[in-house]
Amino acid sequence: MAKSDAPTLFQVNGPVGLANWKDYCYDLSGTKIAGDLTSDTYALKDGDQMLGIGYVIESYGLITNKTLLEKAGYTVDDIKSFDDLKKVAEDITARKDELGFSAFSSAGMDGSSDWRYKTHLANLPIYFEYQADGIDNTDAIKGTYLDNYKNIFDLYINNSTCDPTELAGKTGDDSRNEFLNNEAVFFQNGSWEYNNLVGDGKPFTDDDLTMLPIYIGVGDEANQGLCTGTENYWCVNKEASEDDINATLDFMYWCVSSDEGTKAMANDMGFVIPFKNAVESPNVFVKADKEMTAAGKTPVAWNFSTMPSENWKN
């Protein structure tokens, strides 16, 4: 960035990356691309300044087999909070032999699966702690909602396809295959799983599946959305010339607003972009996130990039 021919457009991965580069970042507040975001949740801010804009997003939550849920006597409308989820999961467990399926697929702690819990699930108590404290990063995570984290994980492992003593050896493939085989109603994972579940040779159609928020009993659960975020933020070098800055802003806006740009982002690059003119995705989980956001529900931001280290997670 200190070179004479430094780039005008660059990328950071989130608050931690921004901390290293924010002195170079142009304030994007009031720009056309900022106005085209579907939610300010996808902007990276430092105080009142918008220093980064997420340009590709993914969502994760509880992938839900609606068909099995209905066989158990419930619909997705019955699950609007942690208490609701707990009631449904424990009732399914109580009738597991009769129903022929479990509430949750295995929460395996093998390395192919544990990231779902020590990173993605752990994001929720951190997010709500940051919300309560009015911050988006910290030098010391307090653990305000660790009990809630324990409660949701206990719900997973005590209402699962397997005994908790078996989880150490369970893999990500095990969990997915249990879900594919109609052995569980809920499967914590993300929008990237869509092609593993729906399509040629797969057992599900779009009508069978949806994604629910991961409720942990904190915050405004009635208005909670999916965990939707990114580790890919566009930033503009404020040290560049005015002409280069303006040309870069025009290019960014073209990418997310024009027919040619949005089709290139969606079809050529496979991106889901958080902008008003985005090409419609066929992914049922992406559609669920879009519907929740349009209904005014707040996406849970990805704060796991602020976790101190892998050792801290372990």
Question: Where would I find each of the regions flagged by the language model?
Answer:
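Short, solvent-exposed loop/beta-turn-alpha elements that line the ligand-binding surface or hinge
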Residues: 27-40, 104, 108-111, 126-151, ...
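A structural signal for short loop-to-beta-strand junctions that line the ligand-binding cleft
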Residues: 7-8, 34-69, 100-102, 220-227, ...
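Extracytoplasmic/periplasmic solute-binding protein
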Residues: 51-55, 60, 86-138, 184
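Glycine-centered hinge/linker elements that transmit conformational signals in sensory
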Residues: 89-90, 135-169
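Hinge/lid segment of periplasmic solute-binding proteins
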Residues: 12-61, 116, 120-122, 208-212
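Conserved N-terminal structural module of periplasmic/extracytoplasmic solute-binding proteins
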Residues: 1-17, 30-33, 168, 218-221, ...
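Extracytoplasmic/periplasmic substrate-recognition and gating elements
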Residues: 72, 161, 201-267
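C-terminal capping/gating helix-and-loop segments adjacent to ligand/active sites or protein-protein/ligand interfaces
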Residues: 228, 270-277, 287-314
